[in-house]
């Protein structure tokens, strides 16, 4: 399931929560709400880089993704570790993937372009 939040600047965010990949991601989140930014909880062992990539590239098709709740040491000093599951996800995406880094605030415009706080 998850949550959809719409902001007054036009940004529509889908918070996946701990949900798995499901067909409503296309019909409800992608087609109806037209989410342009997804906060993808990627830590579950049930969600592989391949299934998450399919959900983002084929079902929701957001402008950008924030990988969160990854349950691994995906970064060192704020930089992506190339051997991580998260790095595999980033390589397969057709859109920018931003990393949720503790203490870092990210700002997005209405089209899900990161305007501050992203690398």
Tell me what each language-model feature is.
Residues 1-30, 102-119:
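Core dinuclear metal-dependent hydrolase active-site scaffold
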Residues 11-13, 37, 64:
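Structural motif
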Residues 17-19, 42-44, 70:
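Active-site metal-binding loops of divalent metal-dependent hydrolases
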Residues 21-26, 48-56:
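Alpha-helical scaffolding within the catalytic cores
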Residues 29, 54-119:
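Binuclear metal-ion centers of metallo-dependent hydrolases, dominated by the metallo-beta-lactamase
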Residues 31-39, 43:
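Active-site metal-binding motif and surrounding structural segment of the metallo-beta-lactamase
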Residues 43-49, 74-77:
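Acidic-and-aromatic substrate-binding clefts and catalytic sites of carbohydrate-active enzymes
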